[in-house]
Amino acid sequence: MVEPLLCGIVLGLIPITLAGLFVAAYQQYKRGKELGV
């Protein structure tokens, strides 16, 4: 009975992880643009 819970956790974490990576990349890009790189 643990597998459905694990599946839910994984399915919940994947979008959060992708969103976090996207935000981090966007902030880095914006900061680089401000520095004129």
Swiss-Prot record:
It is found in: Cellular thylakoid membrane. Disulfide bonds: none annotated. It comes from the Bacteria. Its main location: membrane. One of its GO terms (cellular component) is plasma membrane-derived thylakoid membrane. It is a single-pass membrane protein. GO terms for molecular function: electron transporter, transferring electrons within cytochrome b6/f complex of photosystem II activity. Keywords: Electron transport, Membrane, Photosynthesis, Thylakoid, Transmembrane, Transmembrane helix, Transport. The chain crosses the membrane at residues 5-25. GO terms for biological process: cytochrome complex assembly; photosynthesis. Component of the cytochrome b6-f complex, which mediates electron transfer between photosystem II (PSII) and photosystem I (PSI), cyclic electron flow around PSI, and state transitions. PetG is required for either the stability or assembly of the cytochrome b6-f complex. The 4 large subunits of the cytochrome b6-f complex are cytochrome b6, subunit IV (17 kDa polypeptide, PetD), cytochrome f and the Rieske protein, while the 4 small subunits are PetG, PetL, PetM and PetN. The complex functions as a dimer. Belongs to the PetG family. This is Cytochrome b6-f complex subunit 5. It comes from Cyanothece sp. (strain PCC 7425 / ATCC 29141). The gene is petG.
